[in-house]
C-alpha cells in the first residue's frame, strides 16, 4: 500500500500489529533521529526491495539494510542539521500553500462575480 515503508518517531507507547516494524535504537551506538532520517533516505530503495505486489516489508528485508554509522556525536549533529533544514522547508511550503489558497479563493470570486454580472467585463 501507499504507507508501506513510511517512518515515524513515536514518543508514546503504542500497540501494533504484524504490519508494522517497531525499532528501538541503542542510544550508545545509534541515535533515534539519525535512524529515522536514514530510513527516510532509503524509502524508495526499501519499497523497491519488496516490490509493489507485496503487502508489507518483512524484518528479513530490514535486517539486510546497510545503515552508515558515524560516531554518536556526528549522528546528533546530522540529525540537528536535518531537523533545522526540514523545518525551514516545511515552513516555506506552508507559506506558499497559504498564498496559493488566497489566489485560488480570488480566482473563484472573480469567476463568480463575472459570471453573475456583479463585475462588469471591460472590452
Q: Language-model features: where?
A:
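Short, charged beta-turn/beta-strand-edge "cap" motif at the junction between a beta-strand
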Residues: 1-6
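N-terminal start-of-chain detector that recognizes signal peptides
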Residues: 7-8, 35-41, 81-85, 93-94
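Basic, amphipathic alpha-helical recognition segments used for DNA target recognition
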Residues: 9-13, 20-73
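N-terminal alpha-helical segment
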Residues: 16, 58-61, 85, 107
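Amphipathic alpha-helical coiled-coil/heptad-repeat segments
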Residues: 69-123
